[in-house]
A protein has these predicted regions:
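Active-site histidine-anchored catalytic micro-motif
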Residues: 2-231
Length: 231
């Protein structure tokens, strides 16, 4: 019988893959972003509105020396996770992540989904030649070769059946589309009423999304064991 022996959680922010000298670029991206969503209300604010509400002390933290130290700290923390994982030597990794508009679209958007095919493909991220240095650095933070990752189908099926028995409305999948694409609508409250935007993704070759492939690269260090991916 399977036992839960180790739990690990990690961010997979692009900043974790990028050198500290590129971190300031995210402020420029935020100025262009029309979907700056703030907790706990989920309200959408413009960059200027967010700046007015922000703690003024944050400005003192926005410099290269502090970013460099923060990058060193996050690298050390992820290395610690990788060492903990390696030393524990798990037989199976149940991996829970958010799709973030990569594989699931509004033609079928499950609340949560358990994958129980025999394996799941990963395809390397390939930025355009004219992509920004930040985008290239992010892509390099994921596995650089195509992978066929084994799935522990018996455990995955057990999770599906257990959840059904306990009245959870769980979705399941034994395979993923080779060239997924579609639309996802985002709806947020704002001072002027609800804002709705639609993100369109053209069909393209895609496999295991980045929330999981980041862990494969940085925590598992591409030493593959059977996994159970849960969306």
């Amino acid at each position: 019988m399977a036992e839960i022996g180790l739990g690990i959680g990690t961010s997979h922010s692009p900043m974790l893959m990028q050198p500290a000298e590129l971190w300031a670029n995210h402020a420029l991206n935020d100025q262009r972003n029309k979907e700056l969503c703030f907790a706990p209300s989920g309200e959408i604010l413009s960059f200027e509105e967010a700046l007015e509400r922000a703690n003024p002390g944050i400005a003192d933290l926005c410099n290269y020396d502090i970013h460099k130290k923060q990058k060193e700290n996050t690298d050390a923390a992820i290395l610690k996770l990788a060492e903990t994982y390696k030393n524990y030597k798990p037989d199976i990794a149940v991996m829970i992540g958010d799709d973030q508009d990569e594989m699931m679209f509004e033609d079928n958007m499950p609340a949560f989904l358990v994958y129980w095919g025999d394996s799941i493909k990963y395809y390397p991220r390939k930025p355009n030649p004219d992509a920004s240095e930040a985008a290239k650095a992010s892509a390099a933070g994921y596995p650089q070769t195509e992978l066929e990752i084994p799935v522990q189908t018996d455990l995955a099926r057990h999770i599906i059946e257990y959840m059904i028995d306990h009245e959870f409305d769980v979705s399941h999948s034994k395979y993923l589309r080779e060239n997924p694409g579609g639309t996802v609508g985002h709806r947020y409250p704002s001072a002027n009423g609800e804002i709705e935007t639609t993100r369109v993704t053209a069909p393209r070759q895609f496999g295991l999304p980045h929330a999981w492939s980041f862990v494969v690269k940085r925590v598992m260090e591409e030493n593959l064991i059977p996994i159970v991916p849960i969306w």
